[in-house]
Amino acid sequence: MSEKVCEVKNLTYIYPKSDKGVKNISLYVNKGSIVGLLGESGCGKSTLAKCISGQLKPGEGEIVCKKIGYIFQDNYASLNPAKKVGWLLKETIKYGNPEKFFEYEKRIKNILEEVELDESVLTHYPNELSGGQRQRIGIAMALLSNPNILIADEPVSALDVTVQKQVIKLIKKLNERKNLAILFISHDIKVVREICNYIYILKDGELVEEGESETLFTNPSSEYTKNLLDSSYLE
């Protein structure tokens, strides 16, 4: 039986003074799997991700997740522009493992190798890096906590097609090498089909269908999913 590294039961979060949010969501992610959360923009994907990662507190439901690493859509917004990359990585290590702070040089070298970056990036500020390099730094920072699961919130949507493919390839490698579970959130159908082995479909804050990737793509059961998959990219 597969080990669950993250499970959500009957989760509901509604934004204050609004009817927007997510309602009665239940899902799970097994160790070593890449699970997709697919839906149109504004359907609640990022809200759900923020609830799972602790950025938002749900009004109802239960979340049981082991150690989480979070990859943002645009890591330029999450990286301190006034600090060089080397400092950012050191502080991430210090925050997550203060007792091992003295090992930071070795840890940083290893993590840069994992995300396929040269050590020269350490002396640069985030705005001096390309979008692909910043996203790799974001992935490196997420990995520094030794997570059991990565939540990847639209991790390639801000990148051009060539760089998208490179980052997707890297995420696949990390999944295979580390047996790392990944919750991959996207509105790009082609990307989700390429990388995910199980998919949840979200519409207006509610789950409408779930299933193994190829089964869902070849034989969807809901009318909404059928219409959704007729397009190759959701605006």
Please tell me what each predicted stretch does.
Residues L38-E40:
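The feature captures the beta-strand-to-loop junction immediately N-terminal to the Walker
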Residues S53:
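Helix-to-loop junction immediately C-terminal to a conserved catalytic motif
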Residues F102-S120, L229:
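Conserved ABC ATPase "signature" region
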Residues Y125-L129, Q133:
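Conserved ABC ATPase signature
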Residues L144-N148:
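A short, proline-enriched helix->beta-strand linker immediately N-terminal to the Walker B motif
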Residues V192-E194:
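A short, surface-exposed alpha-helical micro-motif characterized by mixed small hydrophobic
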